[in-house]
Regions:
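A solvent-exposed, acidic/Ser-Thr-rich amphipathic alpha-helical stretch
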Residues: 58-127
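Generic ordered-secondary-structure signal
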Residues: 35, 41-44, 72, 96, ...
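Short, low-complexity N-terminal intrinsically disordered segments enriched in polar/charged residues
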Residues: 1-54, 58-66
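A beta-strand edge to alpha-helix "cap/lid" segment located at domain peripheries
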Residues: 2-29, 98-169
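Charge-dense, low-complexity intrinsically disordered segments
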Residues: 31, 35, 80-83, 136
Length: 169
């Protein structure tokens, strides 16, 4: 996106067309350590979704860098709030989640590590967001998430997330 406030229009492949995704053919890990790291990277992505859905802010702060950066948009609608620290994301979620009367679930699929070094990783995933109440289960939105991770003191953490939602919810 050309600026923080620009929003690409909805169309098939809008994330790729507007340079928000960069999925490439999978690469073989360079050795056993990178292969094990790749498994952990997948789990960190899943833990991020769990931490949001279950309001596990202690987990969230353990898997995000302090200077974590969150950006995103709803295609053709609006940018999402730009959040620039892990503590600010926790504060934002603590204010927003109680306004909902449902249980959100982020289901990730098609997770692919597109770039990996010994200390950094670029990861893409699809997310299906659902809402559950005692009466119904409702699909809310689909999205792509792009994660940039760094390995700090031997621990993989998310440094940045871009969430590209296909529709408002």
């Amino acid at each position: 996106m050309s600026s923080e406030t620009s929003v690409p229009p909805f169309s098939g492949g809008w994330g790729h067309t507007h340079g928000l995704t960069d999925v490439r053919p999978p690469r073989m890990p360079l050795g056993l350590e990178q292969a094990v790291d790749r498994l952990v990277i997948h789990e960190v992505v899943a833990a991020y979704c769990w931490s949001v859905d279950e309001a596990q802010y202690d987990l969230m702060t353990q898997i995000l860098t302090e200077d974590f950066d969150f950006q995103g948009c709803i295609a053709g609608v609006a940018p999402l709030d730009h959040i620039t620290r892990a503590a600010d994301l926790v504060t934002w979620l603590q204010a927003w989640l109680p306004t909902r009367c449902d249980q959100l679930r982020h289901s990730t699929s098609n997770v692919i590590v597109t770039e990996q070094t010994d200390t950094t990783a670029d990861v893409h995933a699809y997310v299906t967001l659902t809402s559950a109440t005692p009466e119904a289960l409702t699909p809310l939105a689909t999205a792509f998430y792009r994660f940039w991770l760094v390995k700090q003191d031997g621990t993989w953490r998310i440094a940045k997330v871009f969430s590209g939602f296909d529709r408002a919810f």
